[in-house]
């Protein structure tokens, strides 16, 4: 059992690491539709912790509060961004929006899982 768990952990780390290598400064990437975008990294960190904790009621409440306060946004279409920085340990990216429109050039913090693969 212990050997199987170790193998699973190594394979998971390799999969995450291989995708994280694609997320690099200066890269242009597409963000999935309906992803949550944060104006402050602290709000993203809290969102990630609540999501990981598994308490869906608390997570949904926080997300709704952040969206309502305009500390976070949810765009319904896929959008193109430029990676400003990426922290693989935290799975957090600071991005600049490249898709033409009202928010062109704005900077955001997003979860690393928000990128299209």
Tell me what each language-model feature is.
Residues 12:
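Active-site phosphate/ATP/adenylate-binding loop shared across adenylate-forming ligases
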Residues 21-37, 43, 96-117:
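Boundary regions of SH3-family modules and the immediately adjacent low-complexity/disordered segments
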Residues 15-17:
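N-terminal signal peptide c-region/cleavage motif recognized by signal peptidases
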Residues 72-112:
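SH3/SH3-like beta-barrel superfamily modules
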Residues 1-8:
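Bacterial N-terminal signal peptides that target proteins for export
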Residues 2, 19-20:
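Intrinsically disordered, low-complexity regions enriched for glutamine and histidine
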Residues 22, 27-83, 87:
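Beta-loop motif signature
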């Amino acid at each position: 059992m212990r050997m199987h768990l170790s193998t699973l952990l190594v394979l998971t780390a390799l999969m995450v690491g291989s995708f994280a290598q694609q997320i690099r400064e200066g890269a242009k990437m597409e963000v999935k539709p309906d992803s949550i975008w944060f104006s402050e990294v602290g709000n993203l960190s809290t969102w990630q912790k609540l999501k990981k904790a598994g308490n869906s009621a608390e997570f949904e409440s926080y997300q709704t509060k952040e969206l309502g306060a305009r500390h976070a946004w949810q765009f319904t279409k896929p959008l193109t961004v430029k990676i400003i920085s990426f922290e693989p340990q935290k799975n957090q990216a600071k991005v600049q929006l490249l898709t033409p429109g009202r928010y062109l050039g704005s900077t955001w913090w997003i979860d690393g899982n928000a990128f299209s693969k």
